[in-house]
Each structure stands twice: as C-alpha cells, then as structure tokens.
C-alpha cells in the first residue's frame, strides 16, 4: 500500500462538510481527515444526531472518499476534557478512522488547565485502552506550547505505546515552535506517524498558510528526510489561508487543486 494522502476538512472552515467533501473529491483525492474541533470547525461532532452523522457517511461513500482520520482536538492536560476526547475517539471509530489527531492543549479554545509532560503522558496512557478497543492511533500535533517534534517526542516516549505518535504539522513547527525544520525532523523522526502538510507564507509569526507550493516552506527537505528515514506516514493537507480566511468557496477549491498538483509534480500519487 502506498502513502495515504488526504485533505483536512478544516481547509473548509466556515463551510459545510458537504462542500468540503465535494471539493476534496473533485480535486482527485481519495482520503479525508474529518474535523471535530470544538468551537472552531465542527464538521462532525459527538452531539450531532445519528441521522446527521449517517448522512455524512453516505456522502463520503457517494464521492469515493475514505475518512481515514479525524481531528478531535481537546486539552489533554485538563482532566475535565478527557471525557470529551473519549467521545471523539468513539466518533472516529463510527466513521472507521484509523487515526485521531489532537494537540496537547486546546487548538482554538482557551486552556483551562496546564500540566507537566509527565502528567500529560499519564493522561494519554489512560486513553490507550480506548484506542486499542477501537483500533485507533492517537497522533499528537505540533501546536502551541508543544510546537516542536522534539517536545512531543519526549511525551510520546513517556507514554510508551505504539498507539501514540506525533502528527508533525510542518507550518506549526515554524509558526509556534520556531524550529530548524531539518534538525527538528531528525530529532523526532522515529515518533512521526502522521503529517499535516501545511505551507507557510508571509513572516514566520503571521497567520498565513496557503496552498502547498505557494509559500516558502522547504517541502523538498521534508520529503527527502522522510524518504531517507523510510517513513511513509500519511499526509493530510491543511490550508488555513490568512487571518481573514478564504474569500469564498472557489478560492478554497482552487487551493486544494493547486496542492494536489504540487504533490503530483513531486511524484506522489493521490
């Protein structure tokens, strides 16, 4: 089996899951990362009715898209949010996903709790039986205060389970972590199980994440590092535009198509 290449439905923030499914399929992709991020993009969510969730499942099948992962960000430092994350695990299982993505802290809400890496590892370790029960792998995203692969690898190593790895978000590692990309990839490569391919435009600290190939992030370096390490982790494309967002649906659809063309030009098969 070749590398899975998907698109994160969060690219369609502010638009419906149906619009996301249609645009991603039209660009030639066969896989999707569903977004269930509280307070931000709730394309699917545990409190939606069974009928509504089934409609989404049928639309995916109709368009030939496999929901192989789900973005279910919760603050894993906060005991009060662990139950919410377990609900997200079960929702991911409902869609037949193999991966669930979360940052350590909240992705788009204020953190109500902070904790040491050891405490976070304990919280995650307690989730492993749920992950095993549903056949899921939890991938921790480079985000916020945990913006480097190096930091996340320390937590993953403390957890010590094959069910837990890193989701290396390429642009986040620069935007949040201010890393030397090559060195950080080297330091965390053996724990990277998943990758958000996200480009970076503008100044490093500016919210600017365009279509792949439209920014300045060194993707050939990333691809070379992965190839040399024999790491064929799934790719999930994420495009978040600028703080103002995409101007319309057509701009998102074009950015998704541009990203597909960028990857195929680099020898990848969608």
Model-predicted regions and their roles:
Residues 71-78, 213:
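The substrate-binding groove and active-site-proximal loops of carbohydrate-active enzymes
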Residues 18-19, 31, 54, 59-63, ...:
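Active-site acidic/histidine proton-transfer and metal-coordination neighborhood
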Residues 1-9, 13-31, 61-64, 96, ...:
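Histidine-acidic metal/acid-base catalytic patches
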Residues 11-13, 36-38, 73-76, 104-108, ...:
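Active-site-proximal loop/turn and secondary-structure-junction residues that shape catalytic pockets
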Residues 44-52, 80-87, 111-122, 147, ...:
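Alpha-helix N-cap and loop-to-helix initiation/capping positions
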Residues 30-41:
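A short beta-strand-loop structural module common to alpha/beta enzyme folds
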Residues 6-9, 69, 137-142:
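Short catalytic-loop micro-motif centered on adjacent basic/acidic residues
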Residues 33, 69, 101, 139, ...:
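Conserved beta-strand positions in the central sheet of alpha/beta enzyme cores
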């Amino acid at each position: 089996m070749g590398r899975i290449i998907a698109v994160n439905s969060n690219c369609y923030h502010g638009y419906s899951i149906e619009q996301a499914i249609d645009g991603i399929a039209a660009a030639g992709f066969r896989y999707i990362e569903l977004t269930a991020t509280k307070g931000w993009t709730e394309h699917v969510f545990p409190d939606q009715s069974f009928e509504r969730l089934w409609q989404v499942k049928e639309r995916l099948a109709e368009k030939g898209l496999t929901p192989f992962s789900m973005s279910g960000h919760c603050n894993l430092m906060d005991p009060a949010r662990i139950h919410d994350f377990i609900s997200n695990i079960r929702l991911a299982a409902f869609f037949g996903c193999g991966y669930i993505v979360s940052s350590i802290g909240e992705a788009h809400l204020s953190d109500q709790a902070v904790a040491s890496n050891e405490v976070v590892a304990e919280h995650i370790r307690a989730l492993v039986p749920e992950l095993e029960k549903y056949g899921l792998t939890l991938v921790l995203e480079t985000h916020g205060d945990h913006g480097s692969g190096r930091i996340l690898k320390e937590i993953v190593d403390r957890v010590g389970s094959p069910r837990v790895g890193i989701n290396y978000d390429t642009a986040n590692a620069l935007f949040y972590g201010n890393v030397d990309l090559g060195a950080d990839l080297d330091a965390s490569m053996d724990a990277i199980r998943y990758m958000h391919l996200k480009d970076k435009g503008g100044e490093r600290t500016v919210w600017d994440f365009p279509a792949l190939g439209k920014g300045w992030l060194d993707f050939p370096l990333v691809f070379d590092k992965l190839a040399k390490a024999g790491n064929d982790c799934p790719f999930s494309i994420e495009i978040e535009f600028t703080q103002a967002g995409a101007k319309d649906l057509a701009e998102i659809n074009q950015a998704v198509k541009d990203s597909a063309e960028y990857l195929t030009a680099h020898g990848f098969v969608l």
